[in-house]
């Protein structure tokens, strides 16, 4: 399998990832090594795109899909769609949420140990995510006009208004203490 096809770019290929000893890429699956940690970044930046992937979680797992992100400061200079065990969190931190900014409209995750599908489409200010075919987030990032504040008035951790963050950046797959697996990560530029 080549890393680029007419369908897009296969992100889980050594030439497309900044691989390190904290992650294992084997037989098309990516998972944390015995000494796991941190976020694994794409080599390239992406602006407008559609990414699709499959993931599965272990018990009480917390992970995330970072996008349009600066790897040097991912929390403040980028975006994350939350990946987590179903029912583990509440509010704007549940599975499928735009982390700390927009609560997922539906919690669509399968039980730990089962493969889930996720898609994320970004075009200009529009961000749409699905989990297992159900739309979790569909927002216009230009609505986030103040630092540390969501459009609904709730507080977030982002010092910069989300509308002012770059519209291009790296993808990151997060390890946050519990096993998580990824496969079939395909990106198409729009």
Give the location of each predicted region.
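Carbohydrate-interacting regions of secretory-pathway proteins
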Residues: 1-190
